[in-house]
């Protein structure tokens, strides 16, 4: 149990997708103008990560990995070279399902997220979760914890960024830095804050 808690904390703080690896920055910057929208997208990312990382783990372990098709008598078959395409396909399917659910049951959130919901499909943070899982050879339960943790870490980062940007509206920012300029500086300072966790060994 301790190993799973350590993995969760590590994926949220020490190896934060947005502020340690700088993944998913397009949506991170674009959707962090309001806290409500940022929280909505953060929840969507947590759900997609929680579903796709374990799903890709099962597909990789039982179909794509070298020797995974031994149950079918194909002992020497190695399909790991199509792991990237398989991960993208699973992510696209999960996002499509999530989009239909939000459109049906949460139309306000669906309209608020707008074009950025389909962009979760090509959000590199989502894909990185599955690729890191394969690279680090996590088992199924570890991939569930890692999926939840990495999604929650990204959601935490975008929510914090939205809070900072809402406060910046009332600040006297120099004219040349207004808009994206001060946003990138704020993101960099937040990343420096998260660097404090990098020395922690779990």
From Swiss-Prot:
GO biological process terms held by the UniProt record: respiratory electron transport chain; sodium ion transport
Question: Does Zinc appear among the keywords?
Answer: no
As its record notes, the protein acts as a catalyst of:
a ubiquinone + n Na(+)(in) + NADH + H(+) = a ubiquinol + n Na(+)(out) + NAD(+)
Enzyme Commission number(s): 7.2.1.1
Residues spanning the membrane:
11-31, 35-55, 81-101, 114-134, 144-164, 180-200
Which Pfam families is this protein grouped with? Rnf-Nqr
Q: Which GO molecular function entries does the Swiss-Prot or TrEMBL record give?
A: oxidoreductase activity, acting on NAD(P)H, quinone or similar compound as acceptor
Entry keywords, A to Z: Cell inner membrane, Cell membrane, Ion transport, Membrane, NAD, Sodium, Sodium transport, Translocase, Transmembrane, Transmembrane helix, Transport, Ubiquinone
Compartment(s) = Cell inner membrane
Enzyme class name:
translocase
Where is it found, in Gene Ontology cellular component terms? Gram-negative-bacterium-type cell wall; plasma membrane
NCBIfam families assigned:
nqrE
Q: Which family does it belong to?
A: Belongs to the NqrDE/RnfAE family.
Q: How does it assemble?
A: Composed of six subunits; NqrA, NqrB, NqrC, NqrD, NqrE and NqrF.
HAMAP family this protein is in? NqrE
**Function description:** NQR complex catalyzes the reduction of ubiquinone-1 to ubiquinol by two successive reactions, coupled with the transport of Na(+) ions from the cytoplasm to the periplasm. NqrA to NqrE are probably involved in the second step, the conversion of ubisemiquinone to ubiquinol.
- What is the designated name of this protein? Na(+)-translocating NADH-quinone reductase subunit E
Species of origin: Methylococcus capsulatus (strain ATCC 33009 / NCIMB 11132 / Bath)
What lineage is on file? Answer: Bacteria, Pseudomonadati, Pseudomonadota, Gammaproteobacteria, Methylococcales
């Amino acid at each position: 149990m301790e190993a799973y808690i350590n993995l969760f904390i590590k994926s949220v703080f020490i190896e934060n997708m947005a502020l340690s690896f700088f993944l998913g920055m397009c949506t991170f910057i674009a959707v962090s103008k309001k806290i409500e929208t940022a929280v909505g997208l953060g929840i969507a990312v947590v759900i997609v990560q929680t579903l796709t990382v374990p799903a890709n783990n099962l597909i990789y372990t039982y179909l794509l990995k070298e020797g995974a098709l031994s149950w079918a008598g194909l002992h020497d078959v190695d399909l790991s070279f199509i792991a990237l395409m398989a991960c993208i396909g699973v992510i696209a399917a999960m996002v499509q399902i999530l989009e239909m659910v939000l459109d049906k049951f949460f139309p306000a959130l669906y309209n608020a997220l707008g074009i950025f919901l389909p962009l979760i499909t090509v959000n590199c943070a989502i894909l990185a979760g599955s690729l890191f899982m394969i690279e680090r050879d996590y088992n199924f339960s570890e991939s569930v914890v890692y999926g939840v943790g990495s999604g929650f870490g990204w959601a935490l980062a975008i929510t914090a960024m939205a809070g900072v940007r809402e406060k910046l509206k009332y600040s006297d920012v120099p004219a040349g830095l207004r808009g994206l300029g001060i946003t990138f500086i704020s993101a960099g300072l937040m990343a420096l804050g998260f660097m404090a966790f990098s020395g922690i060994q779990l």
